[in-house]
């Protein structure tokens, strides 16, 4: 399968590594300014969760291939920061690069807006479960064994089976939620609840330390669960039926103090979950999650005292 990845970011490159190892041709679409100094290869440290529940540490090399203009790919993965999705699609259009788009990112927009971004491209919505950071020519990442994928009926692309075959070949499983747009909103609301608690105590300068402080305190985690409940009310006010997402939301239904203790134990025991929490350190993205949910909550008149108090303490 021919795959293009937009940019050389952490998430796109982590999946690119998995696909390349499975024998697929993977190329990165880079801006002109980045093309000339793109590294030929990256050293990779990966906590790989595909084969063991605790994950395996892998040390490897990833070969970087840069995409040329006017080419056609089976799939083009776009894992970009909020606000840049439209721009990302424009870059592809400008370079006359064709293929089915896989949107692989957080957004607080409606399906109609996503369709406008895609324009004449076929597209499907998915959501990665990977994270990490990139420094110079080194990728330090975490990869879980599954990702979220829009169902075949809703996606309406002709090569859906090719995509699931690609995932299977890289030993990745997928889950199909009721509706991918709503699922992403819920995911953002949960993120906003957690990070607003973690970050309220100070600047987002050091997200890694904030995450560690949160994971080590069951009382902070209990408070995070209360903040998540408020954030979910915002999603509900947008017209989402939360009953359709029972499995995802189960942990936030039990009493907060019990859930807080359970979460603390889970973080202590599961290095995969712990590591992804500390590696999610994109300050802009964290702030965008909190800000989007909070502003919509205000517009829709949702009562959210905890979120409100937290947002006052957050600055980038």
Predicted regions and their residues:
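NAD(P)+-binding Rossmann beta1-loop-alpha1 motif at the extreme N-terminus of oxidoreductases
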Residues: 1-55
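Hydrophobic anchor at the start of a short beta-strand
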Residues: 3, 25-27, 101, 123, ...
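Residues at the C-termini of beta-strands that transition into short coil/loop
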Residues: 30-32, 67-68, 105, 127, ...
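Rossmann-like NAD(P)(H) cofactor-binding subdomain of soluble oxidoreductases
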Residues: 55-140
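Rossmann-fold dinucleotide-binding core
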Residues: 112-189
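Helix-loop-beta segment of a Rossmann-like dinucleotide-binding subdomain
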Residues: 138-151, 201-213, 269-280
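Active-site-proximal catalytic alpha-helix in oxidoreductases
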Residues: 181-211, 219-232
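NAD(P)-dependent Rossmann-like dehydrogenase/reductase catalytic/cofactor-binding core
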Residues: 225, 232-316
């Amino acid at each position: 399968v021919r795959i293009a990845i937009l940019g050389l970011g952490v998430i796109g490159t982590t999946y690119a590594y998995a696909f390349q190892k499975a024998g697929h041709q993977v190329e990165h679409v880079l801006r002109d300014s980045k093309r000339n100094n793109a590294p030929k290869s990256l050293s990779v440290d990966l906590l790989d969760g595909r084969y063991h529940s605790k994950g395996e540490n892998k040390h490897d090399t990833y070969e970087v291939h840069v995409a040329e203009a006017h080419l056609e790919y089976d799939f083009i993965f776009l894992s970009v920061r909020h606000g840049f999705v439209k721009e990302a699609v424009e870059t592809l259009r400008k370079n006359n690069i064709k293929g089915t788009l896989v949107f692989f990112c957080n957004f607080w927009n409606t399906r109609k807006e996503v369709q406008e971004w895609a324009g004449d491209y076929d597209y499907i919505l998915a959501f990665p479960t990977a994270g990490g950071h990139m420094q110079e020519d080194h990728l330090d990442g975490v990869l879980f064994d599954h990702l979220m994928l829009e169902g075949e009926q809703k996606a309406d692309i002709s090569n859906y089976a090719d995509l699931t075959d690609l995932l299977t070949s890289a030993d990745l499983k997928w889950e199909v939620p009721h509706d991918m747009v709503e699922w992403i909103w819920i995911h953002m609301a949960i993120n906003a609840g957690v990070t607003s608690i973690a970050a309220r105590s100070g600047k987002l300068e050091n997200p890694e330390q904030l995450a560690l402080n949160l994971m080590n305190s069951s009382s902070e985690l209990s408070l995070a669960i209360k903040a998540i409940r408020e954030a979910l009310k915002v999603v509900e006010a947008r017209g989402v039926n939360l009953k359709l997402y029972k499995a995802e939301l189960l942990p936030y239904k039990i009493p907060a103090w019990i859930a807080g203790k359970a979460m603390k134990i889970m973080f202590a025991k599961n290095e995969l979950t712990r590591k992804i929490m500390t590696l999610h350190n994109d300050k802009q993205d964290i702030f965008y999650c909190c800000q989007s949910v909070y502003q919509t909550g205000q517009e829709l008149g949702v009562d959210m005292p905890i979120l409100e108090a937290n947002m006052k303490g957050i600055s980038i």
